[in-house]
Regions:
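Signature of N6-adenine DNA methyltransferases within the class I
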Residues: 13-23, 32, 40-47, 70-224
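Conserved beta-strand positions in the Rossmann-like core of class I SAM-dependent methyltransferases
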Residues: 36
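P-loop NTPase Walker A phosphate-binding motif
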Residues: 26-27
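S-adenosyl-L-methionine
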Residues: 1-2
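Conserved SAM-binding strand-loop segment of SAM-dependent methyltransferases
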Residues: 59-70
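A generic structural motif
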Residues: 30-33, 61
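Conserved class I S-adenosyl-L-methionine
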Residues: 5-13
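Short, conserved SAM-binding/catalytic segment
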Residues: 48-60
Length: 224
C-alpha cells in the first residue's frame, strides 16, 4: 500500500464516521484518497455530512455518501481497503431479506449480519479490517466464516475484550487480512488489550484443526 499514491476505501455501515479522523490521519501522505461511505440509515449520513463539513479535511480526500444496504448494493468498484464496524445482530424478523442475504453467503449457518458483511467485504477489498464480536473465533456458528478467513492472508488479530467501545459490554476483536496475496504468511500477530501484549505466532498452531475454534492465547502451558 505504501507505493500507491491514489487509494480507494470503502466503509460499509459507516454510521456517523467514527473511524474517519483516524483514516484521514493515517493516509495523509497519499495524493488522493476516495472514500465510499455506505449506510442503510439516511439520518446517520445527514449527520456525517455535517461532521465532514466542520472537519474540513484536505481537498485530496473525497467522500461519497451512499444511502443503501451494503449487503444488497451492487458495487462497480473494487477497493484497496474495506474497513469498519459492521452491525452485530441476528436478522430474525424479516425472513424474506434473510433469505436474500443467505443466497449470496457462503456461511448459511449464521443469521448474524456481521458474518454476511465479512464475506462481502472480502469479495470487494484487497485489505479488509473489521471490528466484530469475539464469538467469531470460538462459536460453532462461525466455523465456515473462520475457514473463509483462514483461506485469506490473515495478518493480525487484536483482542479488545470489553474495551472496544465505552459503555458496551460485549467482547470484541478486530482482524486485518489481505485477499490478493500470492503467498500467505505463516505467522500472525496477536495483540491483546487484555494482557497488554503483542506476540507473533504460527497460524497452524493457533488455528489447529485439533480444536474446533481458534486459540489466540495458546501457549506451552496450555499444551501441557
Amino acid at each position: 500500500m505504501k507505493e500507491k499514491k491514489r487509494i480507494r476505501i470503502l466503509e460499509p455501515s459507516v454510521g456517523i464516521g467514527n473511524f474517519l479522523p483516524l483514516l484521514i490521519a493515517k493516509f495523509e501522505d497519499k495524493d488522493e484518497v476516495i472514500f465510499d461511505l455506505i449506510d442503510i440509515d439516511n439520518h446517520s449520513l445527514i449527520v456525517l455530512k455535517a461532521i465532514l463539513e466542520k472537519l474540513k479535511p484536505p481537498r485530496k480526500f473525497t467522500f461519497n455518501l451512499i444511502n443503501a444496504d451494503f449487503l444488497t448494493h451492487n458495487f462497480v468498484e473494487k477497493y484497496d481497503i474495506v474497513v469498519g464496524n459492521p452491525p452485530y445482530r441476528k436478522l430474525t424478523n424479516n425472513k424474506k431479506l434473510l433469505t436474500r442475504y443467505k443466497s449470496a453467503a457462503i456461511n448459511k449457518e449464521s443469521n448474524n449480519l456481521f458474518s454476511f458483511f465479512i464475506e462481502k467485504a472480502i469479495s470487494l477489498g484487497r485489505f479488509v479490517s473489521f471490528i466484530v464480536p469475539k464469538s467469531l473465533i470460538n462459536s460453532p456458528e462461525f466455523d465456515i466464516t473462520r475457514n473463509l478467513l483462514n483461506g485469506q492472508n490473515l495478518i493480525k488479530i487484536c483482542d479488545y475484550g470489553e474495551k472496544g467501545f465505552k459503555g458496551v459490554k460485549i467482547e470484541t476483536i478486530s482482524f486485518l487480512l489481505e485477499t490478493a496475496c500470492k503467498t500467505k504468511s505463516e505467522n500472525i500477530i496477536i495483540e491483546s488489550y487484555i494482557t497488554g501484549t503483542v506476540v507473533e505466532k504460527k497460524k497452524e498452531y493457533l488455528f489447529s484443526d485439533k480444536f474446533p475454534y481458534w486459540l489466540i492465547y495458546r501457549n506451552e502451558l496450555f499444551d501441557q
